[in-house]
Amino acid sequence: MNARSTYSLSAIFGGSAFVFSCRVTGAALTLFLQIALARWMGAAELGIYIIAFSWCVLLAAVSHLGMTPATLRIIGRALAEVRPGLIWGFAERGGQVVFVVSVTVALSASLLVILLTDRLPGSTAAPFLLAFAAVPLLALISFQGMIAVAFRWFKVAFLPSEVFRPALLFLIVAAIWITTSELNATVVMTVQTSLMFVTAVALFFILRLGLRAEIAPEPSEYETKAWLRIGMPLLLISLFGHYFPEFMVILLGPQIASDQVAIFNASYRLALLIAFGLGAIDSFTAPVAARLFAAKEVNELEAVVRRATKLGFLCSVTAVAVFAVFGRPLLGLFGAEFVVGHGTMMILAAAQLVRSAAGPVMSLMSVTGHQDHCLVVFASALVAAVILVFILVPTYGIHGAAVTVLLVTLGWSTWLHRLVVSQVGIRPSIFHAFARV
């Protein structure tokens, strides 16, 4: 099979389809769980769980110091240069960094929660302490999963964390509700943390077996300082690319009631089905882009990106149309009080459409080594998000939060597109993709 057929639209679609199916399945299970939780314990208690879990996700993302998003570039380079020792060293040292930092972050956050219990939603520390206990587990799951993605072991990368864990969480929580008729954020967070522990341990052993079968047993090479220099800018990129919903939930927590947080989160999670599709395409094309850029095959790189952008944009347009027609019934599944979030959901879906139109600009900047140029972009986006939330949310509530997401997404997508054109030398937007038909 030649390189061109390997990177064709059908190949991208085929590779992305599995990742997309895993992520959509996981998202659907999570949505079903949140629908059930909204009915079993109410929007207010659901809001407490969402805020606690959002803190877990965000702190886990910060804890890896950029090692996780840097994995594709570092392992891609090691594979291109045939340096198995570098792969062994990165897997070992990266795991050590992630574990030590995440434990430190979790302990520090737990101490703050104990001191500030009276200011927490519901004035209870238990869900937050459990969420912080899960921070090291989730950080390790993310790091190990990205190593699997670098080798295109998509089943290992996505099935345990995206499908099996949410499915078991749903089944166990449902069983607890059926047998006790009582449920709260603390119980759900306890089950979530337990399943993360099982997932992290299983991934560790599966990944070790895979690496031993794939990589020659050479002495480990360590370039820790260089890896951190690569990873730290990517950390800020990944926060916006993958954890912005959790960031928004945390910003909203002190400003609106927990039931409104639950409505915003439900609207955002539905809109993020579009992002799952885009992420699935990125998961398949990012390792390919890293190798093509390292090999200086710019024309083939642009062709791969053009096909990926077309696929992502067409899927996004279709999804927005579906949400416009069926959005209210979908939100109504959570409960009658959630239907008011339809306008919010459409604004959030529009933000994902903007992102798809720009093309995979974020992953392109990451895997081509231009992540340093993104620092000012996402630092500005972070400041803009905070300012807009404090300006718009007090007056417009969750609609103001959705407009914040749209404006911030438009800003960083446009800015990154210009950087890709100038630094990578290709035009990834949908306008160029269709112009080249």
Task: For each feature predicted by the language model, list its residue ranges.
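N-terminal membrane topogenesis motif
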Residues: 1-29, 220-237, 416-419, 429-437
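Helix-terminus/linker motif at the lipid-water interface of multi-pass membrane proteins
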Residues: 31-45, 177, 242-273, 291, ...
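Alpha-helical transmembrane segments of polytopic membrane transporters and translocases
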Residues: 36, 47-64, 233, 248-249, ...
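Membrane-interface junctions at transmembrane-helix termini in multi-pass inner-membrane proteins
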Residues: 138-163, 350-379, 420
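Interfacial segments at transmembrane-helix termini and the short loops linking adjacent helices
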Residues: 12, 114-131, 258-260, 298-299, ...
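Hydrophobic alpha-helical transmembrane segments
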Residues: 129, 159-211, 380-384, 398-422
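Helix-loop junctions and terminal segments of transmembrane helices
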Residues: 65-81, 150, 249, 267, ...
